[in-house]
Amino acid sequence: MEPVRKVEGKALPLGYSDVDTDQIVPSDALKRIERTGFGRFLFAEWREDPDFVLNKPEHQGAVVLIAGENFGCGSSREHAVWAVQDYGFGAVIAPSFADIFKNNCTKNGVLTVELPKETVRRLLEAVREDPEATVTVDLESRTVKGPGVETTFEIDDFVRYRLLNGLDDVGLTLRHEEDIERFERSRPRYMPRVL
């Protein structure tokens, strides 16, 4: 996993609340066995509407997704995070997230930022008015800056540490590889081994 320090660029003003994982990536896309290539399935059903915000040329290349409350609700579907990330989003800003989706984002290097509903509304309006506006999510300083918005956000210290250092679950485990090997060498031969 790559470290996440700052996500800066254009933002996609989605703004919908209660977007579930089935809306983020349809179930028929889950048959794939690779983690890449899911970006083309992001909001697939909604993208059939030519007026859907993701289809607008002015929002192409956005790296920050701005959503409504309870983003990522529904079934636990890590593919939803893969679709968000594979499309090019490094951060998602919303008033709230479904817990499982938020945890899956952390484990895959996507920064989730919870801001007050009114702040998200102002940011959405500003980006809709000026699609070229830059939004900056700085994990090191725990700040979000955009047109008319400059604020701090809270994030769990351990989550922040993981993201800043690019540590997924495997990366965290490998940080203790020597300790694990030392423990395995010290175990009597008649004890079970981890392979």
Swiss-Prot record:
Its EC number is 4.2.1.33. The keyword Nucleotide-binding does not apply. It catalyses: (2R,3S)-3-isopropylmalate = (2S)-2-isopropylmalate. Keywords: Amino-acid biosynthesis, Branched-chain amino acid biosynthesis, Leucine biosynthesis, Lyase. Pfam families: Aconitase_C (PF00694). Heterodimer of LeuC and LeuD. It comes from Rubrobacter xylanophilus (strain DSM 9941 / JCM 11954 / NBRC 16129 / PRD-1). GO terms for cellular component: 3-isopropylmalate dehydratase complex. Catalyzes the isomerization between 2-isopropylmalate and 3-isopropylmalate, via the formation of 2-isopropylmaleate. Pathway: Amino-acid biosynthesis; L-leucine biosynthesis; L-leucine from 3-methyl-2-oxobutanoate: step 2/4. Disulfide bonds: none annotated. Belongs to the LeuD family. LeuD type 1 subfamily. This is 3-isopropylmalate dehydratase small subunit. GO terms for biological process: L-leucine biosynthetic process.
